[in-house]
Amino acid sequence: MTILIAYDGSDDSKAAIAFAGELLKGESAVVLTVWERAAMASARASVGLMMAIDQLGTEDAAIEGAMRELAEQGADLARQAGLVATPRCDPDSVAVWSTIVDVAEEIDARLIVTGTRGFGGVRSLLLGSTSDRVLHHAGRPVLIVPAPDAASDAVPDAEPGADAVT
């Protein structure tokens, strides 16, 4: 079985790797870091902040190098967690979530593992609604691991296993 783990270096994505390792120790995993091309990021920025076209290629190469290192860091964490991990780094095709879904299809992942949210702003690799969109578009099982501090958000004195609405 091959699993796909979305990784952006955030605490949420680190928690997703750790949980996948606990649950699926010894399984094969592809640790995917998705990055946004500078041209796409600039197009989303205000027109006054756009870079010269020739700078974008240089910036993309630098970003890709950093993202490859980040993917390798994620794969190292996955190996430490007991998974047989391979790093992978892809630029987003349309949106981060669609790249995750596309890669899962390409590698025939039996499961996609992601955190609940990643970094925001320019460093965003797993946007706030990315895990939700992956869940609804993947066509395969998706494991969404809550943030490490989600336990502190629990309602005190609730019965174990009880859901609470606040």
Which stretches of residues belong to each language-model region?
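Small/aliphatic-rich secondary-structure junction motif
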Residues: T2-Q55, L83-T86, V165-T166
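Solvent-exposed polar/charged
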Residues: E22, E105-E106, H136
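Acidic, proline/glycine-rich short linear motifs
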Residues: V34-E69, D102, A151-T166
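Structural beta-alpha unit
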Residues: D76-I112, S152-D153, G161-T166
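Glycine-rich, Arg-bearing micro-motifs that act as flexible, cationic patches
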Residues: L111-R133, H137, A147
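Short, flexible loop segments at boundaries between secondary-structure elements
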Residues: R140-S152
